[in-house]
Swiss-Prot record:
Transmembrane helix is among the record's keywords: no
Superkingdom field: Bacteria
SUPFAM superfamilies xrefs: Ribokinase-like
Chemical reaction(s) catalysed: 5-(2-hydroxyethyl)-4-methylthiazole + ATP = 4-methyl-5-(2-phosphooxyethyl)-thiazole + ADP + H(+)
Pathway(s) per entry: Cofactor biosynthesis; thiamine diphosphate biosynthesis; 4-methyl-5-(2-phosphoethyl)-thiazole from 5-(2-hydroxyethyl)-4-methylthiazole: step 1/1
Gene symbol of the encoding locus: thiM
Species the sequence originates in: Escherichia coli O127:H6 (strain E2348/69 / EPEC)
Coiled-coil residue spans: none
Cofactor annotation: Mg(2+)
Record keywords, A-Z: ATP-binding, Kinase, Magnesium, Metal-binding, Nucleotide-binding, Thiamine biosynthesis, Transferase
Lineage: Bacteria, Pseudomonadati, Pseudomonadota, Gammaproteobacteria, Enterobacterales
Entry's family note: Belongs to the Thz kinase family.
Protein name: Hydroxyethylthiazole kinase
A Pfam family matched in the record: HK
């Protein structure tokens, strides 16, 4: 199994495209991470919108550059709104199947959504393996599997759905079912702040709206988040000071490619 690495030039090119196109991302995400997700997108140069009412969601999904479906705080009314948005979306959409391996209702819902052909799927190893039908597991939103162990499941899921599948962990793996790109970096402190994975899913959604190689663009999203995490940790004393430094680091990365 060959795992390629993303070059700095590829990442910088994707970030230049990101700034140039400034995607409008319709984030149907969970209640815990909305502010952090919106600020992450803004720091990189995208425009977030959090529209959740069923009638409005289906209307707005057709306007946005990209759509994110994150099932972290799923309810039946929210599931109806998400389904309506996916059905009306004429743009790329990304699925974040939070805790899909641990809870039956959201697993059934996410499997139903797969028939609408997501452009990308982003999850930890346990979530991707569960969604692929390989195993059930995970401790709530936390993974109990190493990212590398989920590569075969990610490849299968990508081939079956046509999506770019992202498995996040100490090393992130991005695959279209054939090619695999590995992204190293980041820091364990990133796992001590709620929402870094969910925010990444929003950035992945935005990258799916960019022109060019979608796999490379999505892999670049992982690279930016890991880079920003490393920079933020170097300036932080713990999780509380990490968040503002992380947002600053994303902003600085975006400014650097414009210089």
């Amino acid at each position: 199994m060959q795992v390629d690495l993303l070059s700095s030039a590829q990442s910088a090119h994707a970030l230049h495209l990101f700034h140039q196109h400034s995607p409008l991302v319709h984030c149907m995400t969970n209640d815990v991470v909305q502010t952090f997700t919106a600020n992450t997108l803004l720091a990189l140069g995208a425009s977030p919108a959090m529209v959740i009412e069923t009638e409005e969601a289906s209307q707005f999904a057709a306007i946005a550059s990209a759509l994110l479906i994150n099932v972290g705080t799923l309810t039946q009314p929210r599931a109806q709104a998400m389904s309506a948005a996916v059905e009306q979306a004429q743009t790329p959409w990304t699925l974040d199947p939070v805790a899909v391996g641990a809870l039956d209702y959201r697993r059934r819902f996410c499997v139903e959504l797969l028939s609408h052909k997501p452009t990308a799927i982003r999850g930890n190893a346990s979530e991707i393996m569960a969604l692929a039908g390989v195993a059930n597991g995970g401790r709530g939103v936390d993974t109990t599997d190493a990212a590398a162990n989920a590569i075969p499941a990610a490849q299968t899921l990508a081939r079956e759905t046509g999506a770019i599948v992202v498995v996040t962990g100490e090393v992130d793996y991005v695959t279209d079912g054939h090619r695999i790109v590995g992204i190293h970096g980041g820091d364990p402190l990133m796992t001590k702040v709620v929402g870094t994975g969910c925010a990444l899913s929003a950035v992945v959604a935005a990258c799916c709206a960019l022109p060019g190689d979608t796999l490379e663009n999505v892999a670049s999203a992982c690279h930016w988040m890991k880079q920003a995490g490393e920079r933020a940790v170097a300036r932080s004393e713990g999780p509380g000071s990490f968040v503002p430094h992380f947002l600053d680091a994303l902003w600085q990365l975006a400014q650097e490619v414009q210089a």
